[in-house]
Swiss-Prot record:
Keyword Hydrolase among record annotations: yes
Source organism per UniProt: Dechloromonas aromatica (strain RCB)
Active-site residues, as the UniProt record annotates them: S171, H197, D293
Main location: cytoplasm
Upper classification of the organism: Bacteria, Pseudomonadati, Pseudomonadota, Betaproteobacteria, Rhodocyclales
Entry function: Involved in chemotaxis. Part of a chemotaxis signal transduction system that modulates chemotaxis in response to various stimuli. Catalyzes the demethylation of specific methylglutamate residues introduced into the chemoreceptors (methyl-accepting chemotaxis proteins or MCP) by CheR. Also mediates the irreversible deamidation of specific glutamine residues to glutamic acid.
Ranges for domain CheB-type methylesterase: 159-350
EC number annotated for this UniProt entry: 3.1.1.61, 3.5.1.44
Matching InterPro entries: CheB-like (IPR008248), CheB_C (IPR035909), CheY-like_superfamily (IPR011006), Sig_transdc_resp-reg_Me-estase (IPR000673), Sig_transdc_resp-reg_receiver (IPR001789)
Protein name: Protein-glutamate methylesterase/protein-glutamine glutaminase 1
Length: 350
């Protein structure tokens, strides 16, 4: 009989603990071994129960989820999926949790009929499976992130005038991977369009966080913006992001069409538009993530003459999307996350 994934649910709400536990226990390969109402109880249960994965409420009494997560990752690192409210404060806190080492997050189930219980349970279970299989990432130390920007990312690199456009896709582990990649990108970079699988309530906070850390201007795409050098456009969580041709260059386009590969925004939608309209002037980058979204789109980009890059297995939190792309021949060059910015900038200047 296969060994089940042992999950500890940590949430101050008895109702939420019961609901999450019920959803997880329905999965044939999982079992909830305990449910803790606060950080102190969770700490004791971890010692006794030795769970494989933790689901952790962002906001709890006594010691909040962030403080507990920071201590956990320092003293007893383990895979954690954060459970967050769909608020601006909740999204900012969740992004901080990912920086501290949480593998992924999911919003709390809502009673407004936004999605079915079955759909939510399926996503929760998938994220727990991915978390168990994921590589734990060391949280960043207190060093200045701007100081980590390499010399090649000087304000006057000249790369923005290359006529190239960079397209990036990521999922699980992607918030930190995208940040690390963009820390190596200069202020006058070519335009960059990014799809990160993320709910609507979180993408604006994600873009603001990146903008505060990285040299280029980084915004959440609104649609119909001129695609300009020195600007990075992050897909909003409610729509697909595409590129389209305008009278004087390229524009962003948002499409609230059905999900593709069960995602909206989907990486394949962005990459397909790049292959069709930008062709040899495009550069495609696929980073860490669960599933196969982006693989076919990256292949079409390569077939259209674009340079294509995939994150290697050793540096991925989840080697899913880059693996699928590599297996079908979509990836021209595989490299570590540490090398990605340098390799991509080399392709821009080639």
């Amino acid at each position: 009989m296969p060994i089940k994934t042992r999950v500890l649910v940590v949430d101050d709400s008895a109702l939420m603990r019961g609901l999450l536990s019920q959803m997880i226990n329905l999965a044939p390969d999982m079992e909830v071994v305990g449910a803790a109402p606060d950080a102190q109880s969770a700490r004791e249960m971890i010692k006794v129960l030795n769970p494989d994965v933790l689901t952790l409420d962002v906001q709890m009494p006594k010691m909040d989820g962030l403080e507990f997560l920071e201590r956990l990752m320092r003293l007893r690192p383990m895979p954690v999926v954060m459970v967050s409210s769909f608020t601006e404060a909740g999204s900012d806190t969740t992004l901080k949790a990912l920086e501290l080492g949480a593998i992924d997050f999911i919003g709390k189930p809502r009673a407004d009929g936004g999605r079915s219980v079955e759909n939510y349970a399926e996503e929760l279970v998938e994220k727990i499976r991915a978390a168990k299989a994921a590589r734990l990432r060391r949280a960043m130390t207190g060093n200045s992130v701007r100081a980590a920007t390499p010399a090649s990312a000087s304000p006057k690199s000249g790369l923005g005038a290359s006529g190239k456009i960079i397209f990036v896709g990521a999922s699980t582990g992607g918030t930190e991977a995208i940040k690390d990649f963009l820390l190596g990108i200069p202020a006058d970079c070519p335009p960059i369009l990014i799809v990160q699988h993320m709910p609507e309530a979180f993408t604006a906070s994600f873009a603001r966080r990146l903008d505060s850390l990285c040299a280029p201007r980084i915004i959440e795409a609104k649609g119909n913006e001129k695609v300009e050098p020195g600007t990075i456009y992050v897909a909003p969580g409610h729509s697909h992001l595409l590129i389209r041709r305008g009278t004087a260059g390229f524009l962003t386009e948002l499409a609230a069409t059905p999900p593709v590969n069960r995602h909206r925004p989907a990486v394949d939608v962005l990459f397909d538009s790049a292959a069709t309209l930008v062709g040899r002037k495009a550069i495609g980058v696929i980073l860490t993530g669960m599933g196969k979204d982006g693989a076919q789109g990256l292949l079409r980009m390569r077939q259209a003459g674009a340079r294509t890059f995939g994150q290697d297995e050793s540096s991925c939190v989840v080697y899913g999307m880059p693996r699928e792309a590599f297996l079908i021949g979509a990836v021209e060059e595989q490299c570590s996350l540490d090398e990605m910015a340098r390799r991509v900038l080399g392709a821009v200047s080639a």
